[in-house]
């Protein structure tokens, strides 16, 4: 049985599940409008202070605040006027605006540089400690501090444990980690 906060997932309606789960895909999806309008897809009633806070956690506030219009900056369809990393950070911020109990990050930091990735993970830990986070990543540094790591290879689970345990017990994980550290 799959449980969310101790409750059988089947006891939730689809709408109530959508309210407690935030999903951030690898390919960021933005629509034409303003940054604020895109972020409010997470919670239509969110105020500007809440949007700013989510942007700060997601490491998006620095570039948003540097524009002359801030949260009211126009976004083109698909976010073509933004870099891949900026789009990913805004998509993460949008999920945070929704106050998820479960946050799924599906390789959604792949376009970020290592320093931004690290700071984003630090902020998620500091500001959202009570939120369960599932991070899917091909970057070992993005998940090495996770409580639990599940290693998949060719569609099969080949390892499970902490970073230190997997370095010893899982050749696939150890190879990935050592290759990426070179």
Please place each PLM-identified region on the residue numbering.
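ABC-fold ATPase nucleotide-binding domain signature/coupling loops
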Residues: 3-8, 61-90, 108, 112-115, ...
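Catalytic Walker B motif of ABC-type/P-loop ATPase nucleotide-binding domains
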Residues: 103-106
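ABC ATPase nucleotide-binding domain helical subdomain, centered on the C-loop/LSGGQ "ABC signature"
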Residues: 1-3, 18, 36-77, 122, ...
